[in-house]
Amino acid sequence: MEKIKVIFKRKLYEKMLQWKNNDNGRTAILVEGARRVGKSTLVEEFARREYASYILIDFSKASKEVMGLFEDISDLDYLFLRLQLLFNVKLHERKSVIIFDEVQKQPLARQAVKHLVADGRYDYIETGSLISIRKNVKDIIIPSEERKFYLHPLDYEEFRWALGDTATVPLMRSVFERKTPVGDAVNRKLLRDFRLYMLVGGMPQAVSAYLETNNLAEVDIVKRDIITLYEDDFRKIDGSGRMSMLYDAVPSELNKKASRYQVSSVIGGGVSKATIEQLTAEMKDSMTVNVAYHANDPGVGMSLNRDINRYKIYAADTGLFVTLAFKDKDFMENVIYQKLLSDKLDANLGFVYENVIAQTLVANGKSLFYYTFPTEKGNHLYEIDFLLPQGNKVCPIEVKSSAYKRHVSLDVFCSKYSSRVGSRYVLYTKDLHKEGNVLYLPVYMAQFL
């Protein structure tokens, strides 16, 4: 019996609907995201529900005949006729959409979007992963008519929707807006639910496995398969295996609590700066990781003064991060599962909490920046985990994996840059609490920042 594909509600669907209604064929959209993040499922569901008919061309398995159609697009009438015959679908003017799935496999189709959009008969949606990798774009003209949308792993609210819960996150939001505590018992329950999300993650296949089996060992198998797929992709891009090594080392590098990702400690010395920049840029383009850059001058223009050679790397999905951290061990030996499932909070899990906060901020469209500066004696560094712009101010965020409320780095930073500082946040595991200028938020409320 064929397995039924579970389709999860995604927030990007509403943005796509706005595009369809507002642009009326003037642009195409490119839905970009990591492999296995749910791009194809989302766009096909959108096409099925919002159009009279659609043609989906999956370039990862298209025939030579279909691939060849895009080598000469001088006669669009002929192109549309051939597509309708090959896919046995009737296209209706301004009521049908053509989907170019895995468009990076046929760059000429992506280049053709300019002329297809100008023709105006149909809508066009592209999906792609590794879309910006040099080998996928080096010989084509990128169409300016292409609007990019990014699909990330399910965020926490989407995860709750998948579990059939539409009430919790709106209630959390109203509590956050009123800045009132929820009470210890409720906080413990909300935190336990959020820690489940940290373990399962937001990859649709992992969420499906959890819903089907209620078994984290089965979920872990699915996550291992996704990690293997990513590593295979990295080896195709970089035959030396260095990119795969950089990805595998993300948890261990974060766990060192160093002020940056130390590339040389992972792949050894003797690698040129240009090679390192290319490897990290292409890994970032794959959307399997989130990169936080050091802000050399913490203020509103952080993207202008970021240090591209000083950064931290987070896994784009915290569920994958948990599995990656113990990739060489059996599921039963992965202590992160045991510690997060129990109510015993462990200060040593700071790197897991930091990763899920990075994932949450990126899902909300934020760029990641952090800041370090030397102590008065100069023997170690103060560090602000994340910085968010807020109007003409900057908001420092410190992440704690426990109920620990001390935050020396935050205090010194706010004193040093008092004129630039807006809201100050400590994300931790206890209830919402305001003390002086600092707002203590339970980690599950990071989604509202």
Give the residues covered by each predicted segment.
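Interdomain hinge/linker elements that couple catalytic modules in large macromolecular machines
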Residues: 3, 164-353
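Short glycine-rich substrate-engagement loop in P-loop NTPases that contacts/grips substrate
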Residues: 61-93
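Structural recognition of the conserved hydrophobic beta-strand(s) that form the central parallel beta-sheet
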Residues: 99, 123-129, 150
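Conserved lysine of the Walker
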Residues: 39
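Short regulatory helix/loop adjacent to the ATP-binding pocket of P-loop NTPases
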Residues: 115, 132-148, 160-165
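Hydrophobic anchor at the beta1->P-loop junction of P-loop NTPases
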Residues: 31
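Conserved catalytic segments around the Walker B and adjacent sensor/switch elements
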Residues: 48-65
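A cross-kingdom feature that marks ATP-driven nucleic-acid transaction machinery
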Residues: 2-5, 20-27, 36, 45, ...
